[in-house]
Amino acid sequence: RKTQWTLQKNTGLDFIPSNDFSFYDMTLDTAVLFNIIPERYTKLGLSALDTYFAMARGYQGAAGDVKALAMKKWFNTNYHYMVPEIDDNTEIKLAGTNPFDEFAEAKALGITTKPVIIGAFTLLKLLRYVGKKQATDYADAVSAAYAGLLEKFVAAGAEWVQFDEPYLVHDLTSEDIALFETLYQGILAKKGPGKVLLQTYFGDVRDCYGNITALAFDGIGLDFLEGRKTKELVEANGFPQDKVLFAGLVNGKNIWKNNYGKTLEVIDALKAKNINVVLNTSCSLLHVPYTLKNETKLPEKYTEHFAFAEEKLQELAELKKLADVDYKLDTAFLENTSLFATRPDCRNNAVQERVAAIREEDFTRLPVFKEREAIQKKEFALPVF
């Protein structure tokens, strides 16, 4: 943790996250933090850490035999998360100290971090409900628990606290939006002098843009890369002058270098609207490799186009400097522009020619399905089962 915090500080980042370390999974960490632990695991009578790993990996031993929680894909990534279970008897409350311990650990190093935690709405939407109660039945308890967490962070000296709400990029019902508003009206009422960042990613918030900008968040993080309508939403609806826009413009999911020209064009457009902008990654960098320093066997003609996690931090720092100057004559900008102007491996002329030659009839598959089905049945003669 010390290494990562120090790296980010030395790179020049203004907002350094904490509570992003996990023994196994951040969703599981959040569930445990709020006492969402199924009874079959607590009945084992194990230590807190062993109970955590029993939920993550299962347990077979003297205390009993239980399977791990189910696993699902984390939205549209190849990362998987543990699906927390909640039953009707679960008492949701702030039960853990790990996020506060890490904040204090970083503060002792002279680094005031921005604690990051999965938000109340996303947590409720990802839970597996095994009783009669549903998400709305837990709204008051969850809101109170998160409000308590926020108050504790502010008391500890946190300037910003980030709540990750990727579920907001899904298609939302009016009931979903009402639940989100109920949760955060309670949470934000307790923020005091602290500042709260609502962070979204993996898409745009077209179903709730007006709702989230109307709430008392101090910052809102939007994905300008996977969010197809993000730019349009900001242009059409504006952005509150009393909030900070954390613009996700450095891709947190792929390995490619950032096109500075395209990124700075968006930043310039936002600044022209007098929007207070902070340059951000589109999502967490856990989805990309760690650093290019370890890629000693790849030719430079490939690596010069790559940016892994460490390199993306450097891109953030470099783009921050460029955004505040007349960058079009800056050496870093010109080098980046030159790189993108001479990327021979990204264009295959033969493929371009084939695409250009596509005709309307090429989209019709022949023979028709019934004929293909008859041919396949005759050819393979597969049994019914």
Question: What are these model-derived regions, one by one?
Answer:
Residues R1-F385:
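Domain-level signal for soluble alpha/beta catalytic cores
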